Amino acid sequence: MKNRFIFILFLSILINYGVHAQDYINSVGLRGGLSQGITYKHFVTTTDAVDGILAMRWGGFNITGLYERHIDAFDVDYLYFFYGAGAHIGFWDGDSNPWFDENRGYTVIGIDGVIGLEYVFREIPFNIALDWKPGLNLIGTTGFWGEELALSFRFIF
């Protein structure tokens, strides 16, 4: 029943907004990589956006907020290069994380960078993005985490 409701909601949004993928203000979708989750992006200017990510990994989750700048890439229509920075807070289960020494919960707070490419489809209201989001944990289990390479698929509106 829940899946049917989500599908009907998604379909009604798609029909009501029509096809206008050339320009968009908001997007929501799935992010996949070593961490999987959801992503929501909102443009605050024509080039700058805020991106919120809720990702799950190692029996816990991570909340990330990023500020991103978008510029045209390689003279290809609807292809954008983006870069930015932000912060995260994560809550992890030590039993599920191979890098933690003790079997207890961990909380980390840190800063992030992001660099990537995004393509906006003209014919359908979707985009696809590939990015690398390294992070540096400053509080909790400190250290650099550079393996966050991800592919995101978003519905734009």
Predicted regions and their residues:
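Gram-negative outer-membrane beta-barrel proteins
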Residues: Q36, G60, A73-D75, F91-N97, ...
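Flexible, solvent-exposed loop segments that connect beta-strands
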Residues: D48-G52, F91-T107
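Bacterial N-terminal signal peptides
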Residues: I8-N16
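Residues on the lipid-exposed face of transmembrane beta-strands in outer-membrane beta-barrel proteins
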Residues: L30, I38-H42, G65-R69, A85-A87, ...
